[in-house]
Structures are given as C-alpha cells and as structure tokens.
Design a protein with these regions (language model features):
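Phosphate/diphosphate-binding loops
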Residues: 79-80, 101, 245-247
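Short coil/turn connectors at secondary-structure junctions
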Residues: 6-11, 32-38, 57, 69-73, ...
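Conformationally flexible catalytic loops at phosphate/diphosphate-handling active centers
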Residues: 99-178
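Short helix/loop capping segments that flank catalytic or ligand/cofactor-binding pockets
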Residues: 23, 113-115, 197-199
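Glycine-rich beta-alpha junction loops
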Residues: 44-46, 106-113, 192-194, 245
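Structural motif
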Residues: 14-15, 40, 105, 189, ...
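Thiamine diphosphate
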Residues: 1-64, 68, 74-95, 164-253
C-alpha cells in the first residue's frame, strides 16, 4: 500500500483487529510520509487473540494510537452495508484531499450482513498528484517520499504543518446523523452496528413517552463535537452505547 500510494495509485488494505495492530507501523510510516491510503478494520473481540464475535473495542486504537508518533487520521464508522460502500468511496476522497491515511472502522456484525447496495458511479477523473514518484526520466526534479528526518527542526516543522492540516479536518469534516433529537432530554450516542440497536430502542422509548433521541457519529475522528454541543441546549443526560468497555464515552464527555 505504501509503495502503490507513493506512485500515485489509490490503494487500500483491510483486516480485523489483531491484523490492524500488525499494520500499525506501516500506517505510521504512511502518515509520516503524507501518503493517502485507506485502511478497513472489521473489528472483532480482543485484546490479544480475543474471539471472532463482533466488537467495537478498537475505537481508541483508531482514534488515538493506530501507530507510533504524532498523528491522527480520519476515521469513518458505517452503520449499514450501503454505508460501508459509501464510506470507502468517501475515504479515498478524504485521503487524496488531505494526503493522509483514512480508516473505515466497521465491526463483525456489519461484516457478515447482507443488504442491498447501490454502488456510486466510478469517478471519471482523479486528483493530480504532482508529488508522486511516477518516474519522468529527467523531465522534472526527483520526487522523494520519506518519513525520516534526521534534524529536530525539520521534523518539528513537518509535524506542526501536519497538525495545522488536522485542525482544518476537525473544522470541516465532522459528520453525524440525528434521529428524534430535536426535543430529546436523553441523548443516546452510538456508532456502527450498535446504533442500529439504539435506534430501535429510541423508537420504543418514544412510544412510552420518553423524550429520547439518537446521535450517531459517522466520523469518529474528527469526533462530531459540534453536534454534541448543539444537543446540550436541551439534553439532560447522555448515554454512550458501544460494544466495548466504554471508549467513545471519553469523547462524549
């Protein structure tokens, strides 16, 4: 993936939880080299070998520390099979726009579902990548893709520039879905397959007269803090629903 991305191709890799851990070093190298690429994690139980049941326990890994060093990457969380396809298309666009790895964080429940899917139309043209190592036989200066910087000043400068780009992503790329949220006194926050169960629970609670709504983060990084802040105007409580021991709750707080 690193090599294909360096040459300007759209490239992706996929695995499930422990396999993503093994890819962590390479993902860090891609981030350090400002290389676009897509990583798909269909999560299963852990830590260690864990189990093959669905899980959402890689939230921290995806949003905090997929690999070593100072970097983030956009993380998309689909909740349907259709959205899994849509998120992959979106991930490639984000990767190219911001020159960064992007993760699609699904789970084993979604990974084993069968639902109708309408694939988006293929793009007729892709963004130009003048930085890529495409080989022009002396027609231009050599392009170098690298994550090694031996002077502290050079590394610091690049990290500062990268984090300025992250602030642009935080400002422009927060995505979420609101369901029965306008007057909700209790806001359920759930992503991925958990949000499907939460949505049914919200409908049942409404039938009982309970003012509850669902906020579904679609981007886990950047987390949709603006949507959380908007809900604070009427919410009395937030309930974080996730297939783990409580990882997203840190961001909800």
């Amino acid at each position: 993936v690193y090599g294909a991305a360096s040459a300007g191709a759209r490239a992706m890799t996929s695995s499930s939880s422990p396999g993503i851990s093994l890819k962590g070093e390479g993902i860090s190298y891609m981030a350090g080299s400002d290389l676009p690429g897509v990583i798909i994690n269909v999560q299963r139980g852990g830590p260690g070998l864990g189990g093959i049941q669905p899980s959402q326990s890689d939230y921290w890994q995806a949003t905090r520390a997929t690999g070593h060093g100072d970097f983030f990457m956009p993380v998309l969380a689909p909740s349907t099979v259709q959205e899994m396809a849509d998120c992959v298309y979106r991930a490639f666009d984000l990767a190219d726009e911001y020159r960064t790895p992007v993760m699609v964080l699904a789970d084993g429940m979604l990974g084993q579902m069968m639902e109708p899917v309408v694939l988006p139309e293929p793009k007729e043209s892709l963004p130009e990548k003048p930085w890529a190592t495409t080989g022009h036989k002396g027609k231009r200066a050599h392009n170098i893709v690298n994550s090694l910087y031996l002077t502290a000043d050079a590394l610091e400068k690049l990290n500062i520039e990268r984090f300025e780009r992250y602030e642009v992503i935080r400002e422009n790329e927060q995505r979420s879905e609101a369901f029965m949220l306008d007057d909700a006194e209790i806001v359920v926050v759930a992503f991925g397959a958990s949000s499907r169960v939460a949505r049914s629970a919200v409908v049942a609670a409404r039938e009982e007269g309970i003012k509850v709504g669902l906020l579904r983060p679609i981007t886990l990084w950047p987390f949709p803090t603006k949507a959380i802040e908007d809900a604070l105007s009427h919410a009395k409580a937030f309930l974080s629903v996730e297939m783990n021991m409580g990882q997203m709750v840190d961001d909800v707080r």
